[in-house]
Amino acid sequence: MTPQPNVPILPEIVRQHAEMAAFLWTVYDHHLLHPEENPDMDAERLERLMERLEAHLDGLRVAGEDGKRIAGERYDAYPEAGELFVVRMLEAKAAIPVRQLDLDLTRRYIAENLPERN
């Protein structure tokens, strides 16, 4: 998805894209690490989850700089793994499908860049 120049955005909708993408990444990653915890997450449901995650990331990309800004604001307010994942995905020059990510590298980046918790 390419940003649409000079097209007004709806900030609340873009915020929802950021929140849902962060949440869906967290669900996806947790499932891959602990598949036994949710036996109902079969291949079809996992595929739907991936489609939704990609759609929310696309919604942020279409919003261009506003999408990046809003995702950054969500991360500033909630510095969690999902929010950092979204910010990082939006930094790429071209969209990278989540399926093509090296999950070990992605997890390592997140672990190394999340702020320390008290």
Q: Where do the model's predicted regions map?
A:
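N-terminal alpha-helical scaffold/docking segments in eukaryotic complex subunits
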Residues: M1-R117
